[in-house]
A protein has these predicted regions:
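C-terminal helical subdomain
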Residues: 5, 68, 91-116, 120, ...
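A short helix-coil junction within the Rossmann-fold of NAD(P)-dependent oxidoreductases
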Residues: 10-22
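Alpha-helical segment proximal to the catalytic Tyr-Lys
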Residues: 13, 57-61, 118
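Residue(s) in the substrate-gating loop at a strand-loop-helix junction
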Residues: 28
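Short, flexible catalytic-loop segment of classical short-chain dehydrogenase/reductase
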Residues: 49, 70-81
Length: 133
């Protein structure tokens, strides 16, 4: 949380000068729902959601949008290191029956950073294949 807070504090003055900006934070479905054995990770990612919503309220009137993305289990090196039996269970828990691809998450980041999302502020977007349904 400290790193996100410090970096955001550095860029906000520039965005305020422009009366425009988009901040897109990286949380996780674990920040929304928790996960066994991941107390510290869940707390950090939940904290990012709270920061996002607070900054959206504070900065939105000044032309700066703040949103966060909560990926589920995405085919990254970190997730691929999970034991195969656990990984198979995770895939079965999603309604898409597979891991997400990095590109699928990247497209959501690109959308939120663009003018195409000019009225999206304070949103928490889950990109998880429906794992929480």
């Amino acid at each position: 949380l400290k790193g996100v807070f410090n970096c955001t504090q550095l860029v906000i003055p520039h965005m305020l000068n422009a009366s425009y900006g988009s901040i897109v934070n990286a949380s996780s479905v674990v920040g929304l729902y928790g996960n066994f054995g991941q107390t510290n990770y869940a707390a950090c990612k939940a904290g990012l959601i709270a920061l996002t919503k607070t900054w959206a309220r504070e900065l939105g009137p000044k032309g700066i949008r703040v949103n966060t993305i909560c990926p589920g289990f995405i085919a990254t090196d970190m997730v691929k290191a999970i034991p195969d039996d656990v990984l198979k269970t995770l895939e079965e828990r999603t309604w898409m029956k597979r891991l997400g691809e990095v590109e699928e998450v990247a497209k959501v980041y690109a959308f939120l950073a663009s003018e195409e999302s000019s009225y999206v502020n304070g949103s928490v977007i889950e990109v998880s294949g429906g794992i929480s349904l």
